[in-house]
Amino acid sequence: MLQQIKSYLSKGNRAQWCFFVLFALTIFLQCCLFHWLAFHSILISSLWKNPLAFWALYLPKISISLFIASFVFLFKRKGWTIVVSLLINIWIIAELIYFRANRIFLDAQSFTLISNMDGFWSSVPMYMYSSDLILLLPNLLLISGIIFLAAEKRNTLSAIAIMGVALVTNIGGCLATRYVYDTIYKVPQDKNYFNPFSDEAVDALFGFTSLEYPINTSVVHAFIYATKKLIQLPFESTSYMMTDEDKQLLEPFINVYTSNIKPDRNLILIIVESLETWAVHPKIMPNLWKFIHEHNVIWAQKVESQTKGGTSSDGQLIFNTGLLPIQHGAVCKRYPHNTFPSLSDLYENAALVQPGDLSVWNQKYMSDSYHIDTNYLSPQSLDHVTFTILDSIYRLHPYCMAITMATHSPFLACSKMTKLDLPDNMPENMSNYLRCMHYSDSCWGVFLKKVNTDLVLQNTTICFMGDHIIFDPNMRNTFATYCAENQLDYDVNSAHTAIITYSPNIDKKYIVSETTYQMDAYPTILHLIGCEDYYWKGFGVNLLDSVARNNRPISEQEAFVLSDKIIRANWFESVVK
């Protein structure tokens, strides 16, 4: 049977065409598997429910597969196709890891952050799943084809013809995408939306963030576009000129600049690495739980994480400045010398307790930009040292910010530094995470108890805030299944972080159960320390104000867009002059 097939394919260009189809199918399957591994869906049902959306999703993947596969007609030997397919797999794995960790995809700016991974590469395996092995199937299919098919011929005309078909298919995909998203993205007629690699098409047609682009084109498009942008980075201007319309939109959030505003109480801001709301539990975090229930606090339980590519550094930006992160890259790497509004501005001196060293997230320069006067270093992951330092300095500095690190993924450094009793069959990542949270909470215990007796702390606004969420939906589903089967009361499906704030002028306990945002922390703090007249109000709302929580002056997406422009324009430099 095999000999008959080989004999049939040996005539004319049949083997060549068969291998072309096989290679195109390999790339197409890789694109589809990427979508499935990222979103657990390939939207087959949309073929009959919403055909236009189906073709908008699949035509770009078909076109790029045809285009790359057409090169088999230009080269006799086919071994290069294995290299290409393996490179696509490597890129897919990189995209999936980054997406699972940050909920955005890689872009050119992401590569500028590689140096920040020093000491944190151990976190990567946590985001690699056994299901990712399915990506090898298209490679095995291709290798089998190379072994079976003797297709060592050239056919330039066929290559040109296929490239033409790929171009037409690409145009069809772009047109379909345009009309599907027309109600969301208003694309002017003169936009070059036929070219999915043009900046104007990416911005106008495929959305403002890097999340949309690989979805609406393909993972291969994303690699080509990221490579193009990476080459262009040294020659691109990173600045932006604020328009009159931008400035008009900012008016509700700006007061007249003055340096005379003074806070009426001290401030301690504790940024907790990877704090998710479901971990704030009497068994896991007994000290924080007791503190919440013994004092009048604001406890925002469903806080949307708004960090982007800067992850932890973005959390610090949001809490300190009331701004949101830029859409591409990290503020700490791209704009470390900008002028920023900051809570530190309001105090005579401010201090930071930083685990590790000041090279992480470019902290040395960001401390200067946030007007932090003194940096104290503690050993990475050892939160008990962090709080020992904080306990020794809070009387010296009216504003102290402390960053915890014990709960950084992959949750191994401190998981054995606690005697928390957990079931042996609990998923490993869940168990290690909860143990690290328990250890971190134990480090806060003595400090939190002092609020009952220490007059300085009693007159201090103390905020605990999670810098970002950590688990992707697939891992969260695994945890939820385990909890349901074992009747555990952890609400792991709540993909939110928390804001817990104590202040002597909070007159009762506020449990905020509706969805809020990290950007709400900044205006809430301004209110609690008596500095609501500070020149920058922030895009969020005061969490104590239930009316404001339900009548926001700006949507989250609008705030992201405007904040991106403000930072790229270094607009605050002109405000404080």
Give short role names for the model-derived ranges.
Residues 2-220:
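Transmembrane and membrane-interface helices of multi-pass
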Residues 51-55, 330-332, 433-434, 486-487, ...:
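Active-site rim elements
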Residues 74, 358, 504-577:
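Membrane-interface soluble catalytic domains
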Residues 89, 116, 346, 520, ...:
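Generic recognition of well-ordered alpha-helical segments
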Residues 314, 458, 465-505:
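Histidine-centered active-site microenvironments of extracellular/periplasmic hydrolases
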Residues 317, 403-410, 463-476, 545-548:
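Acidic helix/loop microenvironments that form the catalytic cleft of cell-wall polysaccharide enzymes
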Residues 417, 439-443, 447:
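Active-site neighborhood of glycoside hydrolase catalytic domains
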